Design a protein with these regions (language model features):
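Outer-membrane beta-barrel biogenesis signature
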Residues: 22-74, 197-202, 298-302
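Outer membrane beta-barrel transmembrane domains
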Residues: 68-70, 128-144, 164, 269-442
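Residues that define the transmembrane beta-barrel architecture of outer-membrane proteins
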Residues: 84-90, 171, 179-185, 203, ...
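Residue-level detector of the transmembrane beta-barrel scaffold of outer-membrane proteins
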Residues: 43-49, 103-105, 204-208, 255-259, ...
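Outer-membrane beta-barrel channels and translocator barrels
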Residues: 41, 99-101, 111, 194-198, ...
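Outer-membrane pore/translocation modules
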Residues: 113-273, 393, 411-421
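Transmembrane beta-strands of outer-membrane beta-barrel pores
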Residues: 50-58, 108-114, 184, 193, ...
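Residues on the lipid-exposed face of transmembrane beta-strands in outer-membrane beta-barrel proteins
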Residues: 50, 90-98, 106, 187-191, ...
Length: 442
């Protein structure tokens, strides 16, 4: 009996022939609702996404240690607090096709539960915590923390002591803050100028622009509320412009993709005074594996695996210590990296479900790093020195910062936690996320 010899190339060719007639629908990151396209006059996707995120981090603090025998004094990071945050959000979304691979969408994040918890880290107690020590007896730094002194917003001193914090310093360091309410809606447009489904020699390229307007909703704290603790509202008073581009190209049962995006934020008039939100941008590299696809029933099962990284710029924003300290803090830049996997099942042409799990890590970064001030006065964004004196153009800049001069000092600088050697830092910061998503197509 003769045998037919096969080769790897023949197997690939056979597999290609097997899947050549399957619908080459774009990867999820590049799929856009369609309209006025042949026998498909109109598409609309109605989606519901439920997200749960757990964030755990260790809050450490710089602390000057006594010199060892024959050595010099040194600064180390001592353990202060364990930080945990549980966040649950519901995100309804509607995407409506306008023309060939052109759609508009609206999404509204609804925070169902947002709870933060602080407590002393393992090995830390009321007797050895540097934060508890400073709450009892705030240190004197450049005469800024003498009894009766305060710090705060330009024009009006904030009626809050330098160490007027929310920690239960004499017990276990516990503090809990819960937020609720609704967040700002997201309005955007998506367009695929090139589509792999229309031309299988080309990738699908999808461009997206969306805007998150900060209006109408109560924010975490209004400027007129100073002094006082940050509120329990979920909105933060920040407008956000978001830009993204994604690429995908189907090959047999594989659909690799790449997504890059950037968010440009700016504070609204209703934001907490001094808010300078962080910019962020990143990319995601992944692949969809399609082990099962039935064109007759219009069904598909997908395994989606991806890696991501994201950069966060410095800024005066809400941080892991803001609610506990009753203030926004200036944070250093950091990078977030992680991986996620998803199972996607398209049960029918009009219905699909997916479940995603992810784990992410933030690089260590300081979260209290305000500068003491600027010669000649400070300006935004951030705390930037001016070329000439802001309040007296005839005054020569002498290179010195007069901390007693309101024109030159940084009003957001808190010497107890912003002075090098006393700053707070976020270490061992991990995120774990689970997302359930359902979509109905009309």
């Amino acid at each position: 009996m003769s045998r037919v010899k096969t080769s790897p190339m023949m197997l690939v060719a056979a597999l290609a022939a097997l899947v050549s007639n399957l619908p080459a629908r774009a990867a999820q990151v590049t799929d856009v609702a369609d309209a006025i396209d042949g026998d498909d006059p109109f598409d609309a996707n109605l989606e519901l996404r439920v997200e749960y995120t757990f964030h755990r981090a260790l809050i450490t603090r710089e602390n000057l240690q006594p010199p060892a025998a024959g050595g010099a004094a040194r600064t180390v990071h001592v353990r202060e607090f364990e930080y945990m945050r549980h966040t649950a959000r519901v995100r309804p979304r509607l995407e409506i096709g306008l023309f060939h691979d052109l759609a508009v969408f609206a999404e509204w994040p609804l925070p169902a539960w947002d709870q933060q918890n602080w407590s002393y880290a393992s090995g830390t107690n009321a007797g050895n915590s540097t934060m508890a020590r400073d709450m009892r007896n705030p240190p004197v730094v450049d005469n800024w923390t003498e009894p009766g002194t305060v710090y705060g917003s330009p024009g009006t001193e904030r009626n809050q002591g330098h160490a007027d914090w929310n920690f239960d310093a004499e017990q276990n360091g516990e503090f809990q803050k819960t937020r609720s309410g609704i967040d700002y809606p997201i309005l955007g447009v998506r367009w695929s100028p090139v589509n792999n489904e229309r031309d299988d020699t080309k990738p699908t390229i999808t461009l997206q622009f969306d805007y998150k307007p900060a209006f109408l909703l109560p924010v975490m704290q209004h400027p007129e509320d100073v002094p006082g603790p940050l509120s329990t509202f979920a909105a933060d008073g920040t407008h956000r412009l978001h830009f993204a581009v994604a690429f995908s190209k189907r090959f047999l049962i594989l659909d690799p993709y790449f997504l890059a995006d950037y968010t440009f934020p700016f504070a609204s008039d209703a934001a907490v005074l001094g808010l300078e939100p962080r910019h962020d941008g990143g990319f995601r590299l992944g692949i969809e594996i399609i082990p099962y696809e039935n064109p007759t029933l219009d069904q598909k099962f997908v395994v989606d695996l991806s890696l991501m990284t994201r950069y966060f710029s410095p800024g005066r924003d809400y941080s892991e210590v803001s609610d506990a300290l009753n203030e926004l803090t200036w944070t250093d830049e950091w990078i977030r990296a992680g991986a996620q996997g998803a199972l996607v099942f398209r049960a029918w042409k009009f219905v699909s479900f997916d479940l995603t799990a992810g784990a992410y890590y933030d690089t260590p970064h300081y979260v209290t790093t305000e500068v003491i001030g600027c010669d000649g006065g400070c300006s935004s964004p951030g705390i930037l020195a001016r070329a000439v004196d802001a309040f007296n153009p005839n005054k020569r800049l002498d290179g010195n910062i007069q901390v007693r001069d309101r024109a030159e000092r940084n009003p957001y600088y808190n010497p107890v936690i912003d002075t090098p050697g006393r700053r707070l830092r976020v270490d061992e910061s991990f995120y774990f996320t689970v997302i359930a998503h359902a979509m109905v197509t009309f």
